[in-house]
A protein has these predicted regions:
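RecA-like P-loop NTPase motor core
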Residues: 1-29, 45-49, 54, 65-134
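S-adenosylmethionine-dependent methyltransferases
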Residues: 35-38
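Structural recognition of the conserved hydrophobic beta-strand(s) that form the central parallel beta-sheet
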Residues: 56-61
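C-terminal catalytic-base region of ester-bond hydrolases, centering on the histidine
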Residues: 32
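Intrinsically disordered, Ser/Thr/Pro-rich regulatory regions of eukaryotic transcription factors
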Residues: 40-43
Length: 134
């Protein structure tokens, strides 16, 4: 079994420093948001494809495309991967204690279990509002 830990929110520096991030080499931080979404999907999928049994991968990201890619990937490979999301609030960040976070699990259909308010639901909420479903 391979384990993916996704650190998100106000992630403490020590965790960012030791986790995988998806900043393309040679790209200034101010341009990271201009990375085409398909490149993010491909880069994330490739990273997950290259994991070996027993590996633990820490990823630090607030990128919705990365998180949705991980969600879909784990659903497709449910027998091989386990994922947990660690959400750090601004208060957690100020404590400077990496053990302070809210744990969010993922169900077998990619649904978040016990997510805090606003946890990667922006796209879903916006779509529901546009369709008049909320």
């Amino acid at each position: 079994m391979r384990k993916i830990i996704v650190h998100t929110g106000y992630v403490p520096y020590d965790i960012v420093r030791t986790s995988q991030t998806f900043a393309p080499k040679g790209i200034p931080a101010s341009f990271i948001m201009l990375t085409p979404e398909i490149n993010i999907v491909e880069q994330t999928s490739k990273l997950l494809d290259n994991m070996n049994d027993g590996d633990i991968l820490d990823i630090a990201t607030n990128n919705v495309v990365t998180v949705y890619t991980i969600r879909a990937y784990v659903v497709k490979h449910a027998d091989e991967y386990n994922v947990e999301y660690r959400y750090y609030t601004e208060d957690d960040y100020k404590l400077d204690d990496p053990s302070k976070y809210q744990l969010v699990k993922q169900g077998e259909h990619g649904d978040f279990i016990n997510p805090p308010e606003g946890f990667f639901d922006t796209i879903d909420n916006l779509l529901n509002q546009m369709l008049g479903l909320e």
